[in-house]
Curated annotation (Swiss-Prot):
Residues 1-46 form the signal peptide. It comes from the Eukaryota. The gene is BURP4. Keywords: Glycoprotein, Signal. This is BURP domain-containing protein 4. Glycans are attached at residue 445. PANTHER family: BURP DOMAIN PROTEIN USPL1-LIKE, BURP DOMAIN-CONTAINING PROTEIN 4. The keyword Glycoprotein applies. Pfam families: BURP. Residues 158-177 are annotated as: Disordered. Expressed in stamen. It comes from Oryza sativa subsp. japonica (Rice). The lineage of its organism: Eukaryota, Viridiplantae, Streptophyta, Embryophyta, Tracheophyta. Disulfide bonds: none annotated.
Length: 479
């Protein structure tokens, strides 16, 4: 796709007009706002479902507006292009923009994200002073595959129920997928997708399927024997036909809302920080390219050869396969939204698109972004702190998850029936180690979810199910 900017700009203008009309109207909420994050042939529009949380459960959690620490964590990813975008979009009061990825280093110096997004810092010599089409110096290890995400996510327009057949992907002897580190929210992939890479990476691997599920992570995923992780819609985390088919969830990532309370101990090995390499340094990840240059870069599976050549990626490599999977998933998402059926998800290839989607989906000109903050080294086990759980935001959230690509591409969606929580976590018995201020999302209407989830969590159908959003994932709030 070339020339995405014109469609995005038109969508943003339409949103600005609607937002202005809404502000002068007595109506408190527009049932369906136009989304300004446009993909090749169409624009995404937000789903306007309101979360219906169990009052008895949510009453236990105080509502707080104290998200400044998490906002600070998310707000270090602002540059001139996003400032200009906010001006053009009349988003003048935006408090934070977006998170970035980088090297885990608390050292002082220029290029640092001050207390940063997982404490992160960009090396000055790696941050281009001028916009450039070529961001190969931000790409990890040439043709090596991208690092796996925290839990793969997929949007499927046909994902109204559990898959018709159980997955048969083999598990490794220790009960985890050999090909993946845990990932968070998988994206839908084509049947022509390849086997998952064996090297670690920061983004989730994805696969095809008419199945809507999560994998190896905060959301489990059903596996296709011929490819990698399949899909999951925001409306339902349906996955496998039965646990024997192989649900694998990142330790401690998925839990019941009713079991979230001060003193609750998370499973040993729960990881909320970015993956680290052999030298204890957070893996580098691609960054957004500048919007004016991004419009000139094709984002279309039909231009695959040109894209690989532009970024110096070897055809047939694992990374090339991941690039193809992301392009295919986003093109299918665009096609699904072309019929005016209110798709609730969008692939965003620029900060402007992310901001536009969040603003229009939440019905506000000033959305706030929050992300999980890890304090120092992660302990072996976390425990929920006293008075450590509070509700943040209202009845609508927008979650954005990174996808494996040559520059930053985010899968953003507004899940139905979801509420956001801030959870303060401390180390258990690990003196000197830090804790975390985590963001969690709870899905309060699980009546249509696959029974495998309830068996896994020893829960009853309809119980509210939550998951943490690890570093690298961003949650947008309306207030």
């Amino acid at each position: 796709m070339v020339g995405k900017g014109n469609e995005c700009a038109a969508a943003r203008r339409r949103f600005s007009l609607r937002a202005a009309a809404a502000s002068s109207s007595s109506s408190s909420f527009l049932p369906c706002l136009l989304l300004a994050a446009a993909l090749s042939a169409g624009c995404c529009r937000a789903h306007a479902a309101t979360a219906r949380a169990p009052r008895s459960l949510l009453a236990r959690f105080p509502t707080t507006k104290m998200t400044s620490e998490l906002e600070k964590e998310a707000g270090r990813y602002v540059d001139d292009s996003s400032q200009a975008a906010r001006t053009n979009n009349k988003i003048t009061n935006l408090q934070v923009s977006f998170v970035g990825h980088g090297h885990d280093t608390p050292a002082d110096g220029e290029g640092q994200f001050a207390d940063a997004a997982y404490p992160a810092k960009w090396k000055p010599d790696q941050d281009p002073s001028t916009p450039s089409l070529v961001v190969a110096h931000h790409l990890p290890n040439g043709n090596a595959p991208f690092i796996d995400a925290a839990y793969p996510v997929k949007w499927s327009p046909r994902a109204d129920g559990p898959p018709k057949q159980p997955a048969t992907f083999p598990a490794s002897p220790n009960g985890e997928k050999a090909e993946f580190t845990d990932s968070a929210y998988s994206v839908k992939w084509s049947p022509r997708s390849v086997a998952p890479p064996k090297a670690p990476g920061i983004f989730a691997q994805h696969s095809n399927g008419n199945k809507a599920q999560f994998t190896d992570a905060a959301y489990p995923v059903d596996w296709n024997p011929r490819s990698v992780a399949p899909p999951t819609p925001p409306a339902a985390l349906s996955s496998l036909a039965h646990p024997a088919a192989g649900i694998h969830i990142q330790r401690g990532m998925l839990f019941l809302m009713k079991k979230l309370h001060p003193g609750a101990v998370l499973p040993e090995g729960t990881k909320l920080a970015l993956p680290h390499g052999d030298h204890g340094v957070a893996a580098a990840a691609p960054r957004f390219i500048y919007k004016d240059k991004g419009d000139a870069v094709p984002f279309d599976l039909r231009a695959m050869d040109a894209i690989l050549a532009m970024f110096g990626i070897l055809p047939g490599s694992d990374k090339a396969a991941q690039v193809a999977d992301t392009l295919r998933a986003c093109s299918e998402l665009t096609a699904a939204g072309g019929g005016g059926e209110e798709p609730r998800a969008c692939c965003a290839t620029s900060r402007e698109a992310v901001l536009d989607f969040a603003a229009s989906a939440l019905g506000t000109s000033a959305p706030r972004a929050v992300t999980t903050l890890v304090h120092g080294r992660e302990p072996r086990r976390y425990v929920v702190a006293a008075d450590g759980v509070a509700r943040i935001g209202g009845d609508a959230v927008v979650a954005c998850h990174p996808m494996p690509y040559l520059y930053e591409v985010y899968y953003c969606h507004r899940p139905a029936d979801a509420v956001a929580l801030r959870v303060d976590l401390h180390a258990v018995a690990d003196v000197g180690l830090g804790g975390a201020t985590a963001v969690a999302v709870c899905h309060v209407n699980t009546t249509t979810w696959d029974s495998a989830y309830f068996e896994l969590l020893k829960a009853s159908r309809g119980d509210a199910i939550c998951h943490y959003m690890p570093q690298g994932y961003v949650l947008w709030l309306a207030n």
